[in-house]
């Protein structure tokens, strides 16, 4: 491991942490492409397993910062995370059976669709009370969580770009609270994915630790910026959508090129 590669890996982790802190997701979207195309990991499944470690730890670290600022709706977040981990385990088990480049191609297509939906925006939802988690909301949150967890595990990602809109859909919480609350699920889904991939020796622990070092620093900066932008939910949605689409285009191009080569 050279100094240059160490700097590149830590810097890449910083970008991942910044995205997690700012958007409550996007970290895992950025992590796998960065590991493959910048850091130099050659096996897509090892890149996915390794990114899951860093994304999980960074998500939990950023969760603390968001919780300190009062952004987390704990009951909805806990229900979503607990139920979603069941889906994440099943999804990750299936994902490991699929060719890595085909998995990345599907992942890129999914990102593009979600990014376009985020750019379109959504109708303003009636605000739910912070202290009310009625039975209907719990059931709605749980059903969305298990589907989101399955998708997150299948693609080997934390799934923040799915979890944020899913939380808004299920609970009608404001965007900044969905961002903060999503981090519990991002961390939990990443942890389950990590353990599942590690059982098959598909995690590079050295690179993962370097990612974490950069990610914690970047996450702090992202959280500060998220607080400043909390009053402009539409801006957050559009920034989120643009990042997802940009990364999607690159992932689709690279994975398609590998498949047809």
Curated annotation (Swiss-Prot):
Reply yes or no: does the keyword DNA-binding apply: no
Under what conditions is it induced? Repressed by BigR.
Disulfide feature:
none
Q: Where in the cell is it found?
A: Cell membrane
Q: Which InterPro entries match?
A: TM_pro_TauE-like (IPR002781), TSUP/Inactive_protease-like (IPR051598)
Q: Which domain of life is it from?
A: Bacteria
One family from Pfam that matches here is TauE
Q: Which GO terms describe its cellular component?
A: plasma membrane
Enumerate the UniProt keywords alphabetically. Cell membrane, Membrane, Transmembrane, Transmembrane helix, Transport
What's the protein's topology in the membrane?
Answer: Multi-pass membrane protein
TM segments? 6-26, 45-64, 78-98, 99-119, 150-170, 175-195, 205-225, 239-259
Additional comment = Probably part of an operon that comprises bigR, blh, PD_1893 and PD_1892.
What family does this chain come from, according to its entry? Belongs to the 4-toluene sulfonate uptake permease (TSUP) (TC 2.A.102) family.
PANTHER family of this UniProt entry?
Answer: MEMBRANE TRANSPORTER PROTEIN MJ0441-RELATED, MEMBRANE TRANSPORTER PROTEIN YJNA-RELATED
Report the protein name in the record.
Probable membrane transporter protein PD_1894
